[in-house]
Regions:
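Small-residue-centered hinge/linker elements
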Residues: 2-270
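Active-site-proximal helix/loop microenvironment
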Residues: 266-283
Length: 283
């Protein structure tokens, strides 16, 4: 049995249905053309960029000087994603800048092995204070670079302890005449809230702990560090500081005890230099 024939549309309905089909086809055609046009444009831009990158790649000449200017603090792994790092850099948030330790060491090792690189210049102005263990790894890589026969030159307008540990490995160290080099030792500063919490706000804090060397909750029950906390902090800080002084003394061929004595008399040394921190650094 044949199905019943479909009812025929009236001419007006047929006109609008046909018009709709034409509009729908035109819309899809335009969208497809736009999509493929954008796709082709992106491909062209990528090809041009790759071509320019390949053509603009500089070929190292003999006796090349490589400038290494780390910006930020040394980390084992980035703490944020690439988008967040790009946004932070775009808004000028320099405190958020990080350098992966392995990237910096690889750059130093590549310079060591490249026969066309004659010297390396370290610009340390934007290197932020970093972990001592990481700084020692970089210092060891710089020592290997010098041992390979490459000249190492360090420059900075101002140097703190992190920057100077790396600069000390260089053949030559340059400091801005208006700059400074301060080695002040290690310290730890914590805030204590007992007076504010108990005396002013009336907050009672009940601390339960096992053992004397448990200082995590001390800020809530004391106004200053306990003798046990000071002893524990001094134990590890003295060890780190002695290692730091030893590294500096070996790199600069100095006596570690004499170096420590100069740091212990820092105010007197600055006064003897007339307040000129750069001249004091030369002493």
């Amino acid at each position: 049995m044949n199905p019943p024939p479909l009812p025929r549309r009236n001419p007006i309905a047929s006109f609008f249905v046909g018009l709709w089909d034409v509009m729908n086809f035109t819309r899809r055609l335009i969208l497809n053309l736009v999509f493929f046009g954008v796709l082709v444009l992106v491909l062209i831009v990528m090809m041009v960029a790759m071509g320019k990158g390949a053509s603009s790649a500089k070929i190292l000449q003999d006796r090349t000087t490589l400038v290494i200017a780390p910006e930020g603090r040394l980390v084992e792994q980035y703490s944020t994603d690439p988008v967040s790092r790009a946004l932070a850099k775009a808004v000028g948030d320099n405190n958020a800048e990080e350098i992966q330790l392995r990237d910096l060491i690889r750059a130093i090792e590549a310079a060591r092995d490249d026969k066309k690189i004659e010297r390396v210049v370290l610009e340390l102005d934007k290197l932020q204070p970093s972990g001592f263990a990481s700084m020692r790894e970089v210092a060891a890589a710089l020592q290997d670079l010098r041992a390979s026969g490459k000249q190492l030159v360090a420059f900075s307008e101002n140097m703190g302890q992190s920057q100077y540990l790396l600069a000390a490995q260089a053949d030559e160290v340059y400091l801005d005449p208006m700059g400074s080099l301060l080695l002040e030792g290690l310290g730890r500063y914590r805030q204590y809230f007992r007076s504010g919490l108990q005396d002013k706000l009336g907050v009672d804090v009940h601390l339960f702990k096992v053992g004397e060397y448990k200082s995590a909750a001390e800020p809530y029950v004391l106004d200053a560090a306990s003798p046990q906390a000071k002893e524990a902090d001094l134990f590890w800080m003295n060890d780190v500081w002695q290692r730091y002084l030893g590294d500096i003394a070996r790199a600069r061929k100095l006596d570690a005890a004499q170096l420590a004595a100069g740091i212990d008399t820092l105010p007197e040394g600055i006064a003897a230099a007339g307040g000129d921190l750069a001249r004091f650094a030369l002493q």
